[in-house]
Amino acid sequence: MIVTTTNTVEGKEIEAYLGIVAAEVILGANVVRDFLASITDIIGGRSGTYESKLAEGRELAIREMVNKATKLGANAVIGVDLDFETLRDGMMMCIATGTAVKVK
């Protein structure tokens, strides 16, 4: 499966547009981990804890979006966009959207 942020796939022709595919993933953060991450932020370092949570959310959302595209008969997803939202109580949401297409 080709997954790209561009609206075309170089060297490929789009045969069919199969529709918009989207996936939402909500992840919780641990209170102790939040506290330790805030200490890292205060002393000016990078928060590896949150970076790994963001990466986990991104990968899960893309995987779910690809699964939905596969069910539509797509072999590529173009125009992929990732959005992250912070929800209350330490929750984070990652949304992946794109257009499922068939390329040749």
From Swiss-Prot:
Pfam family, one: YbjQ_1
Record-linked Gene3D superfamilies: Hypothetical protein apc22750. Chain B
UniProt cross-references to InterPro entries, sorted A to Z: UPF0145_dom_sf, UPF0145_YbjQ-like
Top-level taxonomic group: Bacteria
Family, per entry: Belongs to the UPF0145 family.
The name this protein goes by in its record: UPF0145 protein GTNG_1265
